[in-house]
Amino acid sequence: MESGTPVRHGIAKFNHDPALYRCPLCREALTLDRSSLRCANRHTFDISSKGFVSVLRGGNNESDLYDRSFFEHRSAVFSAGMYDHVIRACCDSVENSLATAPQTRSLIPESANSFDAPRVVDAGCGEGHYMRRLEARLASVPSQTLNSTDLIAFDISREAVALASRGGGDVEWLAADLANIPLRDGSVDCIANVFSPANYAEFTRILRPGGTLVKIVPGPHHVAELRKTIVDAGLRKELRYSNDDVLQGISAHMRILNTTRVSATTAVDDALLRDFMAMTPVMFHIDQQALELSELDCITIEADVIVASAM
């Protein structure tokens, strides 16, 4: 990538040869033209001075529930370490998948010489905490190939992507739609999709044959303490997580390789609990004033890490 000022680097990192990005309007290749991504049909997407580009068109596709405040509270929870075990599991799975990427590519004649470095996409990146941690992790491993991994992250929330892009770096941040991912077919080695909606048909399209999906979903005891408090207050019937639909959705498009469960319980003080309550979807449409929170002094974060391979 081109060196220079942060602004110039924030633009230059979107330059790929051959073209990586695909126009979401006409599906022609998007190439870097000064400070924009532009296709042959002149559809143009400007790159922000903060180092991200929005390829969304039309009205606001963002939910009012996922506003800037939501992502700022989520960032505070991540910074407190409540999700560190999930982040480690995610990074482990991505790193393991990248270790096999060169061998997988060598079996595909048309892609054998297409790219020197592996490519990872965080689909539904939010404010970018998982991708930032993955960026630091890959930069620290004793492997020149992994050090040069091409990192791309997108979310449908422009607010989230604006937060994610703060601080510069090599990650290519985009505001984009899962239903129309702006990447060309067969261009990605690994997709991370963490506590986020999925589009398995699109994932399969952009993954190379043998590419990997790391899908992370809540485990059965995820936020069990808070869910019990909600049930005890009579605001919901028993709240249970089932990942059967997720597994069926993945299996319809990919081959599931393995599933690992990670869990940790963290003590929470009043400030951390406030941040957590403001960022967990469990609290959507729940009146916090109706809850008895005086005895809620810990929260369990449990996740199932599902690794699947594109067929």
Residue positions per predicted region:
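Class I SAM-dependent methyltransferase SAM/SAH-binding core
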Residues: 119-180
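A short acidic, Gly/Pro-enriched loop at the edge of an enzyme's catalytic core
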Residues: 179-190
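Conserved alpha-helix/loop element of class I SAM-dependent methyltransferases that forms part
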Residues: 81-116
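Conserved Class I S-adenosyl-L-methionine
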Residues: 18-19, 261-311
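N-terminal auxiliary segments of SAM/dcSAM-dependent transferases
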Residues: 2-64
